[in-house]
């Protein structure tokens, strides 16, 4: 990636991070950290582990495209096992994954910061078309797994909690929403999603003029990316299922973060309740995707979900605070990784 683009992503992230930090009540933060004790460090370390699941899902998508497509500057296709080595290393991709999520957390609209950064970093290694298709396919898989996670949560709620009429209506609404989301992405996997997403943007006020111009200028590239997405899904369905399972496992295991927080407040915690809290909170927060770091939405989601499970309001506030601090720390780590990648690129050039 060009130096000016790396600096741009880094400066943007730093500015947003500073703004987010200034919104914190530092006395409340200090009291929360004192109360959490070593569990806070367990939460930070947990996410170092969880990001490996995200990286692994993206990595196998890239490896799958490596086996089917020609290397940059080479007209011959790579046959599985014939290429000497994948040009993308796992731990390099881990840094890019963390940095991409850091930019996504800080960007209104979610995918507007991290995905362009990932494409720009990956392009020198595997080419623009394959970098774009692998990033889009991973982003689709990441979102697709959320719908399955919410469906799992609905099933767990039905099996473990009493249901009255208002709750039943809400669960039915979530079920319909998830079914529509899964259908939309399955169609996207078979026919490609890049062109469809740009067409949707072309009908949104504020973005439609840019989207229409982009479609006119890059229609051929969008068609190529969609063809590669469809080909990757059809040629290697095992890779697709593995990537979805890795992302779904990451969603479920990330409920341990809530369990660690609640163990500070109560002697025993039901892990299924933690899954339900995370599912409702993530659904609520994702509906507010246009807010950077989903400020207020995530905390409100924790407050409502804990209250819905007959926990105290203070439990929801405490969990929301610890999760917010963890996000800020990992945003900072992601920005540091951007600078590390920049220095590594300089060394490679020399």
Regions found by a protein language model. Give the residues of each.
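Predominantly cytoplasmic-facing regulatory/coupling regions of multi-pass membrane proteins
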Residues: 1-98, 165-286, 318-319, 326-350
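Short intracellular "coupling" helices and adjacent cytoplasmic loop segments at the cytosolic face
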Residues: 98-116, 209-212
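Mid-bilayer segments of alpha-helical transmembrane spans in multi-pass integral membrane proteins
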Residues: 101-110, 139-147, 151
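Transmembrane alpha-helix interface/packing and boundary motifs in multi-pass membrane proteins
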Residues: 102-108, 264, 279-295, 299
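Interfacial segments of multi-pass membrane proteins
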Residues: 121-129, 300-315
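Membrane-interface alpha-helices at helix entry/exit sites of multi-pass transporters
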Residues: 126-140, 312-322
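Transmembrane alpha-helix termini and helix-breaking/packing motifs in multi-pass membrane transporters
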Residues: 150-160
